[in-house]
Amino acid sequence: MKAVVQRVSRASVRVSGETVGEIGPGLAVLLGVAEGDTEEDAEYLASKIINLRIFSDAEGKFNLSLKDLCREMLVVSQFTLIADTRKGRRPSFIEAAQPQEADGLYNVFIRLCREEGTQVATGQFGAMMMLEIYNDGPVTIILDSRDRLNPRL
């Protein structure tokens, strides 16, 4: 499972011209589910993102998390994060989870975030969406749940 996490001053998502999710200051999370991902991957990323210290304290240091500040989160499914571009010029999405499996884990991720007290707005799984993201900083971090299996050097 991969996530692109962006600190935002505000963000919104529209489907067919209608706003279906919007937040003020917080995090916009683009979430991609890969074949073989499990609830453990969702648990890892939910905890990591909610507690990631990428908000500045009074001294300007990254010491505060979304949870510390009770900020909001916008979560949008994005299977294109699982693209394999190693061969040729057209991305392959063969490693992306099947839609039913991906939708289930996407919803597990959202539920876990909400259970931690985070206000979560969402896009619509599988829909064509228009995102408006006001990146604050900019601060953008890429996370992969499989990284937890690799020891840090």
Swiss-Prot record:
Gene symbol?
dtd
Protein name per Swiss-Prot or TrEMBL: D-aminoacyl-tRNA deacylase
Q: Which reaction does it catalyse?
A: glycyl-tRNA(Ala) + H2O = tRNA(Ala) + glycine + H(+); a D-aminoacyl-tRNA + H2O = a tRNA + a D-alpha-amino acid + H(+)
The answer to keyword Cytoplasm applying to this record is yes
Spell out the subunit comment: Homodimer.
Motif residue range(s): Gly-cisPro motif, important for rejection of L-amino acids = 137-138
Q: Which domain of life is it from?
A: Bacteria
Function summary: An aminoacyl-tRNA editing enzyme that deacylates mischarged D-aminoacyl-tRNAs. Also deacylates mischarged glycyl-tRNA(Ala), protecting cells against glycine mischarging by AlaRS. Acts via tRNA-based rather than protein-based catalysis; rejects L-amino acids rather than detecting D-amino acids in the active site. By recycling D-aminoacyl-tRNA to D-amino acids and free tRNA molecules, this enzyme counteracts the toxicity associated with the formation of D-aminoacyl-tRNA entities in vivo and helps enforce protein L-homochirality.
Q: Which GO terms describe its biological process?
A: D-amino acid catabolic process
Q: Where in the cell is it found?
A: Cytoplasm
Q: What is its EC number?
A: 3.1.1.96
Chief place of localization: cytoplasm
Family as reported in the entry's similarity comment: Belongs to the DTD family.
UniProtKB keywords: Cytoplasm, Hydrolase, RNA-binding, tRNA-binding
Q: Which GO terms describe its molecular function?
A: D-tyrosyl-tRNA(Tyr) deacylase activity; Gly-tRNA(Ala) deacylase activity; Ser(Gly)-tRNA(Ala) hydrolase activity; tRNA binding
Give the matching Gene3D superfamilies. D-tyrosyl-tRNA(Tyr) deacylase
Organism, scientific name: Dehalococcoides mccartyi (strain ATCC BAA-2100 / JCM 16839 / KCTC 5957 / BAV1)
Q: Which GO terms describe its cellular component?
A: cytoplasm
What does the domain comment read?
A Gly-cisPro motif from one monomer fits into the active site of the other monomer to allow specific chiral rejection of L-amino acids.
